Amino acid sequence: MRGVDDLQSIILTLVTFTPLAGALLLMFFPRRDRDIRVFALVISLLTFAMSLHLPVHFHRAQTGFQFEIDRQWVLTPNIHYHMGIDGISLWLVVLTTFLTPLCVLISWNSIHDRVKEFFILLLIMETALIGVFTSLDLCVFYFFWEATLIPMALLIGIFGHERKVYAAIKFFMYTMIASVFMLAAILWLYAHTGSFDFVVIREQIMSGALPKFPAAAQWLFLG
């Protein structure tokens, strides 16, 4: 049916960006801590509920990626908003959406200062993590990967305990250095395939057009 097909094509977008939409709405909330906590919990539970659509409608006998959406984003270079999941990323997405409301509940009585900022960062990080697990375009993947860095570093630096600033700076620096190697690998793959699309790159490797263990793999490993 058309309605079901339409949902199949947008469900990953809904699951990915619902937490971000919630974070943006939280920015306009008055500083009433209880209301902020309740709203963050509702958004995280809604995201988890939507993510359950994925395992229920996932066809285990089918190979390749499912719930795919592929739209041209940037013409030059050739960047697509391409998202999809396989049997591994499926459960990583569900695990992320399951753990987020637990994080909200666990922090309910332990976070007393900057409550709004805490939950905004938590919801932004949820969107970034889901994006990492569902992106099939390496440029979009890299964007989401870097997007996890800022909220995570701020959560450590603001809401951590002893030596929290040192820990946040160390985390930020190590992740940024590693990301340079990852970016180098992604650019190498684009230079040799003309595409950032994971499916296209995989097909070229399987067909022998690219070596199975190119130099870029070493940079990805370091990243």
Residue ranges of each PLM-predicted region?
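Short glycine-rich loop/turn motifs that provide flexible caps or phosphate-binding loops at active sites
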Residues: A21-G22, D86-I88, L95, I156, ...
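Tryptophan-centered motif/residue detector
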Residues: F17, R71-L75, W108, F133, ...
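Alpha-helical multi-pass transmembrane bundles of energy-transducing inner-membrane proteins
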Residues: D33-R34, E117-I124, A128-L220
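Short hydrophobic "helix-edge" motifs at membrane interfaces and signal-peptide entry regions
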Residues: Q8-I10, A21, L75-N78, E126-A128, ...
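Hydrophobic residues within membrane-embedded alpha-helical segments of Major Facilitator Superfamily
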Residues: T18, G22-L25, I43, T47, ...
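Hydrophobic membrane-targeting signal helices
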Residues: F17, A21, L25, L54, ...
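Transmembrane helix-loop-helix hairpins at membrane boundaries of multipass inner-membrane proteins
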Residues: M1-I11, L26-I120, G194-K212
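Structural signature of hydrophobic alpha-helical transmembrane segments
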Residues: D6-T18, I85-T96, L138-P151, A217-G223
